Amino acid sequence: MEPRAGDGCFLGDVGFWVERTPVHEAAQRGESLQLQQLIDSGACVNQVTVDSITPLHAASLQGQAQCVQLLLAAGAQVDARNIDGSTPLCDACASGSIECVKLLLSYGAKVNPPLYTASPLHEACMSGSSECVRLLIDVGANLEAHDCHFGTPLHVACAREHLDCVKVLLNAGANVNAAKLHETALHHAAKVKNVDLIEMLIEFGGNIYARDNRGKKPSDYTWSSSAPAKCFEYYEKTPLSLSQLCRVSLRKATGVRGLEKVAKLNIPPRLIDYLSYN
């Protein structure tokens, strides 16, 4: 028999959810009053579906902050993993809910869970929530966490064209030339044909001559005479100035949280603005 929506079943990549509990349903829908009644009556807040989805996963993925709070207060496992290895913090970041992210972190959620797939920071970059990205970095998220499918968070942000997230990552000290199969963030920017993104990456020191596993430079993924192609052509003919190269070198030397270090330098405000890419 085919699963039906009314049965609480969901056909997915791995299989399908069956017999989702009333706690799962209330958490996902944001029905906080019903959820509280279920908790008060002794319902288990850590019961999982066949895909190892807990009610906390369900609430986090939908950005249901009030339900997340109720579940955590009732003893929900903050770092429970589903069948894909994702934690509720990963799901909260995927939803872009800063409220859920803050709640989970306040209950001790790991910002860098040992995963081979997307980390919370990857998920925040996918959703395009620069606010979540900034918060995760502030509490110690690994800027170079490597996802076996996507690469680093910077790769993800560039592939999804989330420029605000890209700038937050770069200002925090993310490696602009980090590679996955020799493919850099600049290759992604070229593929999505985003001139603003291309310029930003180059200004932060992106290598326009980097070659991927096919032996292609970023410019090889642009069409002749297109705006992205002309952008690469300009930077090939007009390399970064000495002042720009000095900025790249200094920011690289300051490492993670470089922006904070730059702001404390005893130099003129105009230089601080320049080094901060303002």
Swiss-Prot record:
Residue stretches of each ANK repeat: 18-47, 51-80, 84-113, 116-145, 149-178, 181-210
Pathway given in the UniProt record: Protein modification; protein ubiquitination
InterPro entries listed in its UniProt record: Ankyrin-SOCS_box_domain, Ankyrin_rpt, Ankyrin_rpt-contain_sf, ASB13_SOCS, SOCS_box, SOCS_box-like_dom_sf
Protein name (database record): Ankyrin repeat and SOCS box protein 13
Domain SOCS box, first and last residues per copy: 229-278
Family label: Belongs to the ankyrin SOCS box (ASB) family.
Pfam families, A to Z: Ank (PF00023), Ank_2 (PF12796), SOCS_box (PF07525)
Biological process according to GO: intracellular signal transduction; protein ubiquitination
Keyword Transcription: no
Stated role: May be a substrate-recognition component of a SCF-like ECS (Elongin-Cullin-SOCS-box protein) E3 ubiquitin-protein ligase complex which mediates the ubiquitination and subsequent proteasomal degradation of target proteins.
Keyword Repeat belongs to the record: yes
Keywords: ANK repeat, Repeat, Ubl conjugation pathway
Domain notes: The SOCS box domain mediates the interaction with the Elongin BC complex, an adapter module in different E3 ubiquitin-protein ligase complexes.
